[in-house]
Amino acid sequence: MNLTGITEYDEVNEKHFVDSLSIVKAIDIENIKTVIDIGTGAGFPGLPLKIVYPQLHVVLLDSLNKRVKFLNTVIEELGLKEIDTLHGRAEDYARQTEYREKFDLCVSRAVANLSTLSEYCIPYIRVGGIFISYKSGNIQI
């Protein structure tokens, strides 16, 4: 299906799963209840966060329907609850009151440059919430 350019097992493990979970070094994940993953692609980082922290309510948003269909299959196969997918553009859903300022945490990885990504993501974060952009291999607080 070609959802990611990384195909080697060790590389997938490190660059997708470990990288997705690295934010727990920077935030208190136990205080997070709701997460939206903008431009989720194959489900990273939102899917690993949901698997390891099942108490989270996660929304995975992507503009490509083939990715959303894939994610729906994964969610069903894994029997995950409290996880939703959205097919569409981040800037469009951000205008909807159902999603605007509703999330404790907004994450995004490899979507756009930081200024554009901030415009996409910040509308989703509630007051006091957190926006994390996965932009390098190092965690900076």
State each model region's role.
Residues M1-I36, K66-K69, T73-L86:
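Class I SAM-dependent transferase core
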Residues H57-V59, S63-I141:
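S-adenosylmethionine
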Residues A42-Q55:
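Conserved SAM-binding loop of SAM-dependent methyltransferases across substrates and taxa
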Residues G39-A42, N65:
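Short, glycine/charge-rich beta-strand/loop segments that flank catalytic centers
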Residues L21, L47, E119:
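Active-site phosphate/pyrophosphate- and oxyanion-stabilizing loops and adjacent acidic/basic residues
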Residues I36-I38, L105:
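Conserved beta-strand elements of the Class I
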Residues T4, D10, K15, A42, ...:
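Flexible, active-site-adjacent loop/turn segments at secondary-structure boundaries
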